Swiss-Prot record:
Annotated InterPro entries: ATPase_E_C (IPR038495), ATPase_V1_Esu (IPR002842)
Swiss-Prot/TrEMBL keywords: ATP synthesis, Cell membrane, Hydrogen ion transport, Ion transport, Membrane, Transport
Coiled-coil annotated spans: none
Name the record gives this protein: A-type ATP synthase subunit E
Function: Component of the A-type ATP synthase that produces ATP from ADP in the presence of a proton gradient across the membrane.
Organism: Methanocorpusculum labreanum (strain ATCC 43576 / DSM 4855 / Z)
Subunit and interaction comment: Has multiple subunits with at least A(3), B(3), C, D, E, F, H, I and proteolipid K(x).
Swiss-Prot/TrEMBL GO biological process terms: proton motive force-driven plasma membrane ATP synthesis
Cellular component, GO annotation: plasma membrane; proton-transporting two-sector ATPase complex, catalytic domain
Entry's family note: Belongs to the V-ATPase E subunit family.
Keyword Transport tagged: yes
UniProt gene name: atpE
Length: 192
């Protein structure tokens, strides 16, 4: 019986050690699972935060992009309207009575004579007669000749006889200068 007691003791000791090892393994496994769950939760929270941050960035980019599109469309609409105003003003000037154009040609030629002593005058077809009458009728224009028709809406283009100087007193030039200096005012009137 002594041997059986020793065997039972060894067996009991083995069972206790096995139970202790099993308990330690279960505790370690539980700790590993808990740590894994904590780490997984941290990763999930970080991923959610990153996704939220990226979503916010995308939203900010999309809103900024949409604002740029709206602003570009608004500026294009403003430009279209300003172009229509410019075209309308040019048409109104072109449709003025013939005597107004004749007077303008005469005055522009007088101004040309102050800057050029002799030159060649170019006008559009409508203003040809007025230019020829001014050249033949004004002493200050005795050094001027009519050079022909050019593609302008009105006014005159005068070139010095030596070709060194050209005065562009066309309606387009005057309108362009007025438009450039008044564009800001026109925009404020039209668009506030």
């Amino acid at each position: 019986m002594g041997l059986e007691v020793v065997v039972d003791e060894i067996k009991a000791k083995g069972d206790r050690e096995a139970a202790a090892i099993k308990a330690a393994a279960e505790a370690q496994a539980k700790e590993i699972v808990n740590e894994a769950n904590l780490r997984a939760n941290e990763i999930r929270l970080a991923a959610e935060k990153d996704a939220d941050t990226q979503a916010d960035r995308i939203m900010i980019r999309e809103v900024a992009s949409a604002n740029l599109v709206v602003k570009r469309d608004f500026l294009n609409a403003q430009k279209e309207l300003l172009d229509k105003v410019y075209t309308s003003a040019a048409e109104e000037i072109a449709n003025l009575p013939a005597d107004v154009h004749a007077k303008a040609v005469r005055e522009l030629l007088k101004e040309s004579a102050k800057q050029i002593k002799a030159g060649v005058v170019f006008t559009n077809a409508r203003d040809e007669k007025a230019a020829k009458e001014a050249i033949s009728g004004l002493k200050t224009l005795s050094g001027f000749t009519f050079g022909g028709i050019t593609d302008i809406a009105g006014g005159v283009v005068v070139q010095s006889t030596d070709g060194q100087l050209t005065l562009d007193f066309s309606y387009q030039t005057f309108m362009g200068e007025v438009w450039e200096t008044s564009l800001k005012d026109a925009s404020e009137i039209l668009f506030g």
